[in-house]
A protein has these predicted regions:
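Cap/lid segment of the alpha/beta-hydrolase catalytic domain
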Residues: 129-190, 198, 403-409
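Accessory cap/linker subdomain of secreted extracellular hydrolases
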Residues: 31-104, 109-112, 238-351, 440, ...
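Short, solvent-exposed loop/turn and secondary-structure capping segments
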Residues: 138-144, 166-171, 175, 220-225, ...
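C-terminal subdomain of alpha/beta-hydrolase-fold enzymes, centered on the catalytic histidine
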Residues: 304-462
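Secretory targeting and sorting signals
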Residues: 1-29
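Proline/glycine-enriched tight loop/beta-turn segments at coil->beta junctions
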Residues: 108-113, 119-126, 204, 351-353
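Primarily recognizes the serine-hydrolase "nucleophile elbow" in alpha/beta-hydrolase
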Residues: 136, 206-255
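Gly/Ser-rich "nucleophile elbow"/oxyanion-hole loop immediately N-terminal to the catalytic nucleophile
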Residues: 118-123, 174-183, 191-213
Length: 463
């Protein structure tokens, strides 16, 4: 959590400058504009940075190399998703000073890791994101990085300063780990903007914030708290934190109770889970509900059942995913004021200062939209920022697109709608073209739902 003390910045910078990744075996020799000014790029504040001049910065070109991690991307996209390739440029991996060690990528055992990708053919923009869930900096390479790089954007992603199921152990006070997510995202944005200027000769003309799930939360938080850094953002099913609820800790206990046989379907509907999403519940019982409730409850309310999860969420997959029985009766509203204050430290307000597009699937069975983005949209409206917000419900969308492969007759991937939303945001910001009004994007009865999505679908209905 805390920056490492006792390492002078000048020494850290010299160390960073002295290191470089070995060039990829198939990398073209640097020349002309390929990786120009590579030797001038320094990531401000980084304790370590390693640069590599690569023939392709997309997941197609990086597969099997140290420059991406396909395992950390698992489940986020549908199997048939088409991605662009052939984007040469410079990749910088590194980390900022930090005293926690959850992230073992590159064998560093050091948190606050980041990746910055600088394509040779730059369009003048920068896209920043934070990892979804408790994943790490390469998690959205296929979902986000590939497409924006192909469009000419520089790209930067952070591991948020902690990762993995034991992330809640980071810090000294309840809420510290998640508060660090926000600080690390701001830190990387500022540093990436300067790195971009060093590489291309001027600062980015546009900077966009975006992300999935916890990355969507970060997008909301950044546009509320640091609008000066960004020109807009796309929020893909961002997690909602509010001090008095709703939040994850007001809906997931009921899901845990149902898993353990002490809650009914009607109880699930009452806390926001959608009718029609029941076919997804058995999977979420095994993969999401128990672990998500216990680790986020441990982050904000460690005094409740301190032995579960305790010092670790578990050492095996079964132990990590298993629910804590006491979570079935967890009552966030009745918890001490200190718990609500811990959540308040990272809570959202709806007071966005830049244009924001939110997407949320109507069959999300982890963060049900009725207890999340529906509420956030009302918060934005109540704060007087409604003109800066668009909210699209994706019919047939769920929390991770990978489930489409199991239920292609019931679901649709959100990624193609996300790509359309990003294009709409850019047109909104740069051309003044307002996106369609809030509506539900209907699931088409045919066609290519894996790689196409029209936000202005004629089958849309008003929110």
């Amino acid at each position: 959590m805390r920056p490492i003390r006792g390492v002078p910045l000048a020494a850290a910078t010299l160390l960073a400058a002295a290191l470089a990744w070995p060039a990829h075996a198939s990398a073209a020799a640097a020349g002309g504009e390929h990786c120009a000014r590579q030797d001038r790029v320094r990531v401000p504040g980084a304790a370590l940075q390693l640069g590599a001049c690569l023939p392709d910065l997309t997941t197609t070109g990086l597969a099997g190399t140290p420059y991406t991690d396909s395992a950390d991307q698992a489940g986020l996209t549908a199997a048939g998703t088409r991605t662009p390739s052939g984007v040469p440029g410079l990749q910088i991996d590194g980390y900022f000073p930090d005293s926690s060690h959850f992230n073992t990528t590159h064998g560093w055992a050091h948190d606050a890791q980041f990746v910055i990708r600088l394509p040779d053919r730059w369009n003048g923009g920068l896209v920043v994101t934070g990892a979804p869930g408790t994943r790490k900096q390469y998690a959205t390479d296929k979902a986000i990085s590939d497409q924006v790089l192909a469009e000419g954007y520089a790209y930067a992603a952070t591991d948020k300063g902690n990762s993995g199921a034991d992330f809640y152990r980071d810090g000294t006070r309840p809420g510290d780990a998640i508060a660090e997510w926000n600080a690390r995202t701001t830190q990387l944005t500022r540093a990436a903007r300067r790195a971009v200027a060093q590489r291309y000769g001027h600062a980015p003309r546009r900077t966009y914030m975006t992300g999935i799930s916890n990355g969507g939360y970060l997008t909301r938080w950044q546009l509320e708290n640091h609008p000066e850094l960004y020109d807009g953002g796309v929020d893909w099913e961002g997690a909602l934190w509010t001090p008095d609820g709703p939040n994850l800790l007001t809906s997931l206990p009921t899901a845990v109770a149902r898993t353990l046989g002490s809650a009914r379907d009607e109880d699930m509907y009452a806390v926001g889970f959608a009718r029609g999403s029941e076919f997804l519940w058995p999977y979420h019982e095994k993969a999401y509900w128990g672990v998500t409730q216990k680790i986020y409850r441990a982050e904000f309310d460690p005094g409740y059942d301190p032995d579960c999860p305790g010092a670790s969420a578990g050492s095996t997959a079964d132990r990590i995913l298993a629910p804590c029985p006491a979570d079935a009766t967890y009552d966030y509203a009745a918890r001490p004021a200190a718990v609500h204050r811990a959540v308040a430290r990272v809570s959202l307000t709806g007071r966005i200062g830049r244009p924001l597009i939110t997407l949320h699937g109507d069959l999300d069975a982890l963060l049900p939209k009725a207890a999340d983005s529906d509420v956030y949209a009302r918060m934005v409206d109540a704060s007087g920022r409604g003109p800066l917000h668009r909210y699209y419900t994706i019919q047939g969308g769920t929390h991770v697109d990978g489930l489409y492969d199991t239920y292609p007759d019931r679901l649709r991937p959100i990624l193609p709608c996300y790509r359309s939303a990003f294009d709409s945001l850019v047109s909104w910001v740069e051309k003044g073209t307002r996106p369609p009004a809030d509506h539900t994007v209907a699931r088409p009865s045919g066609g290519d739902v894996v790689d196409s999505c029209a936000l202005g679908d004629p089958g849309a209905s008003s929110r």
